[in-house]
Amino acid sequence: MIDNIRQIAFYGKGGIGKSTTSQNTIAGLAEMGERIMIVGCDPKADSTRLMLHSKAQTTILHLAAERGAVEDLELDEVLLTGYQGVKCVESGGPEPGVGCAGRGIITAINFLEENGAYEDLDFVSYDVLGDVVCGGFAMPIREGKAQEIYIVCSGEMMAMYAANNIARGILKYAHSGGVRLGGLICNSRNVDREVELIEALAERLNTQMIHFVPRNNVVQHAELRRMTVIEYATEHPQANEYRTLAKKIKENTKLTIPTPISMDELEELLVEFGILGGEEEYQKAIAQDAGKAVVV
């Protein structure tokens, strides 16, 4: 029964490390014996590559275009099994500049539901592009598919801006679809006072920073080999960070309706933590950078 499945979604600004974070977290959940399916909802189709050790999985939309209709597909053509038995699907998207990428998500989820893909699962994880919360990309939220949203962010201004926008999208459908915000995952960029900053943002958004993932080069080393850190470097401290995050998500009961803030409030927060200074500080920083310049 779909009603008994924990349906979670990872949203976040493009380039924030959302797909990497989500796959490493799913690997941690799978290690605990959870039965999981990943539904990639990003046109880049990179939501399952670390689980499958592949460049990119063939997407539902791509195969449907080849066959003429999604009804002509078989489930085992688009649903593959990856690391620790995790089921993997990519919805895909249209050619750049043509059509609505969000439509691929709608098509994919409907196809999966109609063909029994949700049977015998504990978790379904949607990995969703989060720069633009348009109708299509908001579909897992709008239709009540994803009940728990985790926003991957960092202490950088645009990542926080995207997180606030996603919170606004969650709020819009919280009462009609029952979706809730599970927390912010800080995927560190080594910004000054990053932990304090994201904790403060979480408080303003009426949520929690569920985990702080430190920056470590082993993540890139694993990615180059198309593996999660948990598989590539099982005993590495970074692998344990993802295991801790997975455990926190499994045990999370703090699911809230977010309270998004205005752009002015976001800028005030950045000023408060010294990330975005006033004009005087800005000019001082430029002068300092100029002084450090080396003429060759």
From Swiss-Prot:
The record's Gene Ontology biological-process terms are:
nitrogen fixation
UniProt KW keywords = 4Fe-4S, ADP-ribosylation, ATP-binding, Iron, Iron-sulfur, Metal-binding, Nitrogen fixation, Nucleotide-binding, Oxidoreductase
Entry's InterPro entries? NifH/chlL_CS, NifH/frxC, Nitrogenase_Fe_NifH, P-loop_NTPase
What does the PTM comment state? The reversible ADP-ribosylation of Arg-103 inactivates the nitrogenase reductase and regulates nitrogenase activity.
Q: Which cofactor does it need?
A: [4Fe-4S] cluster
Where in the sequence is ADP-ribosylarginine found? Answer: R103
Residues binding [4Fe-4S] cluster are C100, C134
What PROSITE patterns has UniProt attached to this entry? NIFH_FRXC_1, NIFH_FRXC_2, NIFH_FRXC_3
UniProt cofactor note:
Binds 1 [4Fe-4S] cluster per dimer.
UniProt xrefs under Pfam families: Fer4_NifH (PF00142)
Q: Which family does it belong to?
A: Belongs to the NifH/BchL/ChlL family.
Protein name listed in UniProt: Nitrogenase iron protein 2
Organism equals Trichormus variabilis (strain ATCC 29413 / PCC 7937) (Anabaena variabilis)
